[in-house]
């Protein structure tokens, strides 16, 4: 299992652990416990399966200058040519990266916002939308690919496979590293304690 899940490290270096960082919710204090352990135990809450980190995708051939900050998503220079992910639980994280990069607010923990922070983040998005900043709010992989491929959008929330899909069309597209870092995510597989299993390991009923 990768050290990212076990210790919150990549290549021996600690990574940001705001929100539900895998290593903070991986271990349980006991077999039937509902309390996460602060150090490794023999009881795991799930089996880690996949992780990645997302950032902004850009069309360097159309932007023609360096992009180094999440704040560029709300730069008036790109009015009407930006897009953000429209899956609330993920999109608000991208929005928070933008809010922090613009110096509007510094979050203690983007993954555990206060009500006031949620309100501020949503208010920032609403104002940008009303001002015509966004070409679209996408929630489908293919939609993000089409927006970028067509040139309707030059900078947007993007997943790495979508960037690859745009490149496969012979179109310049960059999965852009930013000073504010990436928005990371992880997933795992777990079985509910209510599941009935027979001696052969098959689910009953």
Where on the chain are the PLM-derived regions?
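Alpha-helix boundary recognition
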Residues: 74, 126, 148-150, 167-168
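Extracytoplasmic/periplasmic substrate-recognition and gating elements
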Residues: 158, 162, 167-205
């Amino acid at each position: 299992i990768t050290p990212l899940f076990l210790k919150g490290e990549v290549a021996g270096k600690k990574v940001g652990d705001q929100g539900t960082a895998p290593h903070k919710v991986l271990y349980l204090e006991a077999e039937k416990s509902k309390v996460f352990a602060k150090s490794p135990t023999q009881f795991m809450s799930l089996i880690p399966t996949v992780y990645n980190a997302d950032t902004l995708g850009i069309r360097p051939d159309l932007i023609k200058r360096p992009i180094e900050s999440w704040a560029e998503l709300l730069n008036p220079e790109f009015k009407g040519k930006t897009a953000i992910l429209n899956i609330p639980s993920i999109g608000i994280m991208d929005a928070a990266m933008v809010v922090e990069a613009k110096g509007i607010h510094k979050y203690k923990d983007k993954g555990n916002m206060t009500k006031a922070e949620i309100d501020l983040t949503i208010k920032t998005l609403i104002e940008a939308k009303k001002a015509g900043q966004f070409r679209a709010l996408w929630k489908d992989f293919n939609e993000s690919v089409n927006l970028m491929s067509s040139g309707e959008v030059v900078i947007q929330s993007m997943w790495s496979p979508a960037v690859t899909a745009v490149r496969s069309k012979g179109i310049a597209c960059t999965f852009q590293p930013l000073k504010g870092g990436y928005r990371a995510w992880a997933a795992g597989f777990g079985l509910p304690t209510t599941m009935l299993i027979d001696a052969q390991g098959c689910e009953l009923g």
